[in-house]
Amino acid sequence: SGNSRRQSYRRKAYARMTNTFFERGTDKLEDMIASVRHGYMLFETNNGMEDPKNWQIQCTAEYGIEIVDGKLTDHYVSPVVMSGFVPDLLKSISMVSDGFEVIGAGQCGKGYKEWVRVSDGGPNLKVRVKLG
């Protein structure tokens, strides 16, 4: 949806994100973790940007915990950068948890001076994504 928002009535309106969430699914988080041969469970996403013309996205998580043979390990990585082609990322979602959590309030920025409040959160997703 072509939402336009602005920081105040004195500022220019820009197309930008609002509060969009995935609907909760039916999968148990324990089953999602158990289904991963090798991967990472990511925590505390805090940054992201998109390229709407080319459908690319990049997000950052504070940390990730390695999963090996369906079990969380003691190996932490930080920070974690995720990137990819949005349609491919959405098609790769194979499990959606039955939990749902809204995490605090963040901000959507345009340049260095334009900020509006947004929220993030939702269910846990099992997805294939490029990490770097």
Regions found by a protein language model. Name each.
Residues 1-132:
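N-terminal small-residue-enriched
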